[in-house]
Amino acid sequence: FLPEEIRQKILEHLHSVIHYEPVIGIMGKSGAGKSSLCNAIFQSRVCATHPLNGCTRQAHRLTFQPGERRMTLVDLPGTGETPQHDQEYRALYSQLLPELDLIIWILRADERAYAADIAMHQFLLNEGADPSRFLFVLSHADRVFPAEEWNDTEKCPSRHQELSLATVTARVATLFPSSFPVLPVAAPVGWNIPALVSLMIHALPPQATSAVYSHIRGENRSERVQKHAQQTFGETIGKSFDDAVARFSFPAWMLQLLRKTRDRIIHLLVTLWDHLF
């Protein structure tokens, strides 16, 4: 029933979404905890942790494929080491910027020296980076004052630490304006990682949402986040259908029939989402 060109456009878009390979940048100064956060979020150990500052000297592409889905993390070198390195990093970041679906920017919750990060963030905005593609995360939440009160049994901050984290979060939100809230995490013990995953899935562009979700560790998933990924998938297919139909001039009765067909196709594909991703 569907015109061949419309059918072909929908199939092409469906294929591109199902096989989309997301690219996420992980930024932050050396020692911010980038590798630990990656390992806490995703199914595979995608970044090698290292105790020494400055261990990431260049952008490392970490492409992994636990099943049929490919995804790439770009582990970006830390800022604020030396002026010479920062200049090199700026050129590198400008080159990589267009291909990144999202940039997760990691700042230590237990320090206040954010000047290098602020300067680099402003530079990227001046280079045309989309502000809505930045997600700011506070790492090492377990080390904020008073660090000795961290609850090792429950793996969560004490009441006093919660107040400290609220203060730091508010300050960082002011220094780094973003479309999304700043989240504190303690990656090694998994504290607040599911909340970060939820925020990340909402921050991703529509074509990347389902593909990224398929790489998330099981303990970080939730029914609500999965429904969002499914809904976003359906919306992208619907938009593809609408764009294809808009290329033609159809009579009113045909448009009404096409709308019904559109809804059936979306419902079917969303139902099959578990099998597609």
Question: Each predicted region: which residue ranges?
Answer:
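Conserved G1/Walker A P-loop phosphate-binding module
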Residues: F1-L73, L272-L276
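Short loop/turn segments at strand-loop or loop-helix junctions that form parts
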Residues: K29, D75-P77, F136-D142
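Alpha-helical scaffold elements adjacent to nucleotide-binding pockets in ATP/GTP-utilizing enzyme cores
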Residues: A40, E99, A116-F123, S164-R171, ...
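Switch II of P-loop NTPase G domains
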Residues: T56-A59, L76-I103, L107-N126
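Short glycine-/polar-rich loops that comprise or flank the Walker A/P-loop
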Residues: R69, P98-I103, A129-F134, F176-P181
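Canonical P-loop GTPase G-domain recognition
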Residues: D142-A211
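P-loop NTP-binding site
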Residues: V185-P188, V197-L204, G218-F277
